[in-house]
Amino acid sequence: GDWIKNSRDGLTICDATSAAFAMDIDWSKLDVGTFSWQKSLGGEAGHGMIIFSPRAVDRIKTYSPNWPIPKLFQLKKNNEINLDIFSGSTINTPSMICVEDFLDVLNWTKEIGGLEELIRRSKDNLNTIKDWVLSSNWVDFLCEDHKNLSNTSICLKLIDHKLITKSQQTKNMI
């Protein structure tokens, strides 16, 4: 549905870490979006991206909080928006191996058909797990309403009474 209105006040902020590269995201509805490289694309953990809409940039320009902001999160310099971070300057120096890994996976993504193919593969993976769960008599989805199943955060539960009563150590091995 259209639950994020175009004529809204305030900013819409989305942590898209699980959804980026695996689900359709209407980026036009978001003012701030974040994701980590490794969640859906693999690679090195600990690196993230932040995307600002023009509305978010305007908010940064016009709002100064009354509390101190850690240097890593300061988006202003000398009371002006710090445009350096939008033109290639990094806030914190990432490993160049990690950057190269990310560029390599983006090139691979392009070769296999782009974002549409990544989303298709993610949905196919969920369908494979659905088929397996349906054929199983010892496991089910934790999410009981299958309309709410996610192709990026799959949680399963044991349903076989013999398995449920096993020790935690045994369950961990399953």
Set out the residue ranges of the language-model regions.
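Active-site rim loops that border cofactor/substrate pockets in soluble metabolic enzymes
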Residues: N127-L134
